[in-house]
A protein has these predicted regions:
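Phosphate-binding glycine-rich loop
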Residues: 22-69, 83-87, 92-95
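N-terminal "arm"/small-domain region of PLP-dependent enzymes with the aminotransferase-like
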Residues: 1-23, 27
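ATP-dependent adenylate-forming carboxylate-activation enzymes
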Residues: 95-106
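Conserved coil-to-alpha-helix start sites within the AMP-binding
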Residues: 76-81
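Short N-terminal helix/helix-N-cap motif within the alpha/beta-hydrolase-1
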Residues: 56, 74-75
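A general structural signal for well-ordered alpha-helical segments in protein cores
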Residues: 11-12, 29, 33, 105
């Protein structure tokens, strides 16, 4: 593994946020969301704490839930199936191609 490449400016910003008492939903997060929305030419953007949270929110936005099946590769991280169960849907595991780990239609 590699050590993170952080500038002093980045370290100072993290210290500023930690000292503010707001870690996840404070003014810096709101500023970041507004800048991301502006850059993406959209009205709103939402920061989430993890890829797992993002994937679950995506399923919910798409209306995936009870009675739905979601196809996922068998070779994956556990959260892939967990979030599908969490929204009430059923994960359907499919084989992966040897060497590439892409889903294989067989």
């Amino acid at each position: 593994m590699l050590r993170p490449d952080l500038s002093q400016a980045e370290i100072d910003e993290v210290i500023k946020v930690l000292k503010s008492g707001w870690i996840t939903t404070g003014p810096e997060t709101k500023l970041f969301e507004s800048r991301i929305a502006e850059r993406c030419h959209t009205e709103k953007a939402v920061c989430l704490s993890s890829q797992t949270s993002c994937a679950e929110l995506t399923l919910r936005i798409l209306g995936i839930g009870p009675g739905d099946e979601v196809i996922v590769p068998a070779y994956t991280y556990t959260a892939t199936a967990s979030i599908i169960y969490h929204v009430g849907a059923k994960p359907v595991m499919v084989d992966c191609k040897s060497g590439s780990f892409e889903m294989d239609a067989l």
